[in-house]
């Protein structure tokens, strides 16, 4: 696989992370520091690279088992997180339990949900006998960069438009989950 193909693959895999990071940036409002941008982008990048490695090591032998339910895992996680964001958007701003993109548990859930495709890609890369280190590191770095941009962009956009961005973000997460489910059920 040529490096340009690896780069395009990494960009494609990072699109769900971009959507999630834009939402996270919008929800952060005045708490969008460089450290918080790095935290969100790092978690999303590490999960993308890590799931690629896990998929690669699982290889062809387990592909049929993983493909049977990976879309349900992603859908369920994104439905839950999106639903929580929508529910939280109806509450008062001061209430505890508001969707927090900096919460480690939330970040891990988002990391898993947005990197399920990377697991399948890792399996495919094992079949192709592609060099794992190049693939996984490129996927992780590209996802980090795109996610960092997404958090920053989402934060700037969110400050300019006074909308219920957590409501919109929740709908986006549910939309991503639904897209993953439909693609796997009807188009794979």
From Swiss-Prot:
InterPro entries tied to this protein: Mntp/YtaF, Put_MntP
Entry keyword annotation includes Electron transport: no
Keyword Ion transport part of the UniProt annotation: yes
A single GO cellular-component term on record: plasma membrane
Membrane-topology annotation of the record: Multi-pass membrane protein
Keywords from the named record: Cell inner membrane, Cell membrane, Ion transport, Manganese, Membrane, Transmembrane, Transmembrane helix, Transport
TM segment ranges: 2-22, 40-60, 66-86, 107-127, 133-153, 167-187
Gene Ontology MF terms: manganese ion transmembrane transporter activity
HAMAP family the UniProt entry points to: MntP_pump (MF_01521)
Homology family: Belongs to the MntP (TC 9.B.29) family.
Name used for this protein in its record: Putative manganese efflux pump MntP
Gene that encodes it: mntP
